[in-house]
Curated annotation (Swiss-Prot):
Similarity comment: Belongs to the heat shock protein 70 family.
Any one GO MF annotation of this record: ATP hydrolysis activity
Source species of the chain: Shewanella baltica (strain OS185)
Keywords: ATP-binding, Chaperone, Nucleotide-binding
Annotated S-S bridges: none
Entry-linked SUPFAM superfamilies: Actin-like ATPase domain, Heat shock protein 70kD (HSP70), C-terminal subdomain, Heat shock protein 70kD (HSP70), peptide-binding domain
Superkingdom: Bacteria
Lineage, highest ranks first: Bacteria, Pseudomonadati, Pseudomonadota, Gammaproteobacteria, Alteromonadales
Keyword set includes ATP-binding: yes
Xref: InterPro entries: ATPase_NBD, Heat_shock_70_CS, HSP70_C_sf, HSP70_peptide-bd_sf, Hsp_70_fam, ISC_FeS_clus_asmbl_HscA
Record's protein name: Chaperone protein HscA homolog
GO BP of this protein: iron-sulfur cluster assembly
Length: 620
């Protein structure tokens, strides 16, 4: 999946063929598959021209029905027709039974407490059901694109935990499909609008689907999407709009004690009415009863708005809470992206615009925007993007390191290392009693920080005030499969830590990489000399710092003549260290070390004498 084929400067990487990859929005209500073709990203329709696949699976004695076919039978066979299986992913049977919602399915429990659906074909788990939804989407993609897929990107809610994410991966694995990445749904929506390459700042993703409402507040910083906060309501969605319409129609028609078939018919008509009122001021609702009686009524947009106003208000309240959790205001939100078919409802768009103070982004079909973002990401990950559009790397093109004393670079992860990768090194304090340490993360092949690319800075506080060199700080560099670098510094004795995230590839072109590599070779000899000089200067500063502290504490162990000689030699070290002769600095340090050997021995003897003062030989 090489995105960037690294070659030495002056050499060219071999060209590669277009690789087939797709993005899949595995939704609660509907699922879609999208791909980039001839530079255009679009969802792929089935043979009937339908883009969305209802996320419904029905098990019969002889077959497994998926999508619209399963949906047609859901009223007649609800027990074996599994809808919204995404809600069951990663949840235990105990959690499901403890919830308020009841389900028509017969459940069994697996050995590890997970739910199993009892069907005419035996017991199946949510992962297997999800795989059945993925199966026709994969088949559709391979037929449309004309070949076998090399990978897929599947979207998941930002709040999905590890178990739910792993379940999604396992569903694809059952089909033998390689998952290039699981992508957060709000991030996918932002990518679809190209917000990942635009102005840095805060973005809100308002996602009102069929069964759930999610609001995500993201911050875009140097090409990295950080999820600041998520909120919403897992039991509020467009389905609730449908149920309110259904209740209204039942009341007008004075229908009571209805069976499951009529209930399903009413619900289907409610959805049609809701969709019609998106563009019309009013529409006619119509159902035919089992005895052939035809019932009709006119439903106006004003009536519908009144029915759903309280629910829309609840979503805005969730937005307000989530913004507060994120620590941002509506004025700071640059864009609001609308996701989910229910955001087509005019009242929803009006209320969102009123709350955020600006029109939301709606130019991309809200049902398809997540799948489109996933497809864009899949195209990048599989290696089809030209180098000028570089976003993600499968190897690290330039070394990553940390600045040490003297402006030196300590490389932690070397260039051309395959990602994902994690590397750790230990560092220590320079001064006695040092309680904080500033970290400067850099990128490049040169020996000095001044010649490398600065990536990020952060500070670790709360280091125990120990002698210089006594504290142990473990610095871990971790680069994930997206090329996102996380640097964590931890003081080992206390566990106190600090971290930062940055995308090393952000704003870095292939030309710049080649230039930096050429410079590292061109100036290699000079850089080594400059590094040796800086190292000796740092050592001189360390020795002088340590000796000043020792003299301040135990200077009375020296007579005036001895003190004068040491002071003179220290002054010489300081003077030579200000120059540019590394060998001369080394010799000056060695002379000072030799001259202070006796002083060091006296300090040791004095420390032992003080430690054992007042103790008898038997106590030692």
């Amino acid at each position: 999946m090489a995105l960037l084929q690294i070659a030495e400067p002056g050499q060219s990487a071999a060209p590669h063929q277009h690789r087939l990859a797709v993005g899949i929005d595995l939704g609660t209500t509907n699922s879609l598959v999208a791909a980039v073709r001839s530079g255009e990203t679009a969802t792929l329709p089935d043979e009937l021209g339908q883009h969305s696949l209802p996320s419904i699976v029905r098990y019969t004695q002889d077959s497994v029905e998926v999508g619209a076919l399963a949906a047609l039978s859901s009223a007649q066979d609800p027990q074996n027709t599994i809808v919204s299986v995404k809600r069951f992913m990663g949840r235990s049977l105990a959690d499901i039974k403890a919830g308020e919602q009841s389900f028509p399915y017969e459940f069994a429990e697996s050995e590890n407490g997970l739910p199993l659906f009892v069907t005419p074909q035996g017991q199946v788990n949510p992962v297997q059901v999800s795989a059945e939804i993925l199966r026709p989407l994969i088949a559709r993609a391979e037929k449309t694109l004309g070949g076998e897929l090399q990978g897929v990107v599947i979207t998941v809610p930002a709040y999905f935990d590890d178990a739910q994410r792993q379940g999604t991966k396992d569903a694809a694995a059952l089909l033998g499909v390689k998952v290039l990445r699981l992508l957060n749904e709000p991030t996918a929506a932002a990518i679809a609008y190209g917000l990942d390459s635009k102005q840095e700042g805060v973005i809100a993703i308002y996602d009102l689907g069929g069964g759930t409402f999610d609001i995500s507040i993201l911050r875009l910083n140097r090409g990295v999407f950080e999820v600041l906060a998520t909120g919403g309501d897992s039991a509020l969605g467009g389905d609730d709009f449908d149920h309110l319409l259904q209740a209204h129609m039942q009341q007008v028609w004075q229908l009571s004690d209805i069976d499951s078939q009529l209930s399903r018919q009413l619900l289907i008509e409610s959805r049609r009415v809701k969709e019609a009122l998106t563009d019309a001021a009013e529409t006619e609702a119509k159902v035919i009863l089992a005895d052939g009686t035809e019932l009709t009524q006119i439903v106006s947009k004003a009536e519908f708005d009144a029915m759903i106003a309280a629910l829309v208000k609840k979503t805005i309240a969730s937005c307000r809470r989530t913004l507060r959790d994120a620590g941002v205001t509506t004025d700071e939100v640059l864009e609001t992206v609308m996701v989910g078919g229910s955001t087509r409802v005019p009242l929803v768009r009006e209320q969102v615009e009123a709350f955020f103070g600006k029109p939301p982004l709606t130019s991309i079909d809200p049902d398809r925007v997540v799948a489109i973002g996933a497809a864009i990401q899949a195209d990048i990950l599989v290696g089809n993007k030209p180098e000028s559009d570089l976003l993600l790397l499968d190897v690290i093109p330039l070394s990553l390191g940390i600045e040490t004393m003297g402006g030196l670079v300590e490389k932690v992860v070397s260039r051309n290392t395959t990602i994902p990768v994690a590397r750790a090194q230990e560092f220590t304090t320079f001064k006695d009693g040092q309680t904080a340490m500033a970290f400067h993360v850099v990128q490049g092949e040169r020996e000095l920080v001044a010649d490398c690319r600065s990536l990020a800075r952060f500070t670790l506080k709360g280091i125990p005030p120990l002698a210089a060199g006594a504290a142990h700080i473990r610095v871990t560099f971790q680069v994930d499969a997206d090329g996102l670098l996380s640097v964590t510094a931890m003081e080992k004795s206390t566990g106190v830590q600090s971290s930062i995230q940055v995308k090393p590839s952000f704003g870095l072109s292939d030309t710049e990489i080649a230039t930096m590599l050429k410079d590292s070779m061109k100036y290699a000899k000079d850089d080594i000399g400059r590094r040796m000089l800086a190292e000796q200067q740092v050592e001189a500063a360390r020795v002088l710092e340590s000796l000043h502290a020792a003299l301040a504490k135990d200077g009375d162990l020296l007579n005036a003549d001895e003190r004068g000689q040491i002071d003179a030699t220290m002054a010489n070290v300081a003077q030579v260290a200000a120059g540019d002769d590394a060998d001369a600095i080394k010799l000056a340090i060695e002379k000072l070390d030799e001259q202070t050997q006796d002083f060091a021995a006296r300090r040791m003897d004095n420390s032992i004498r003080v430690a054992f003062k007042g103790q008898s030989i038997d106590n030692i």
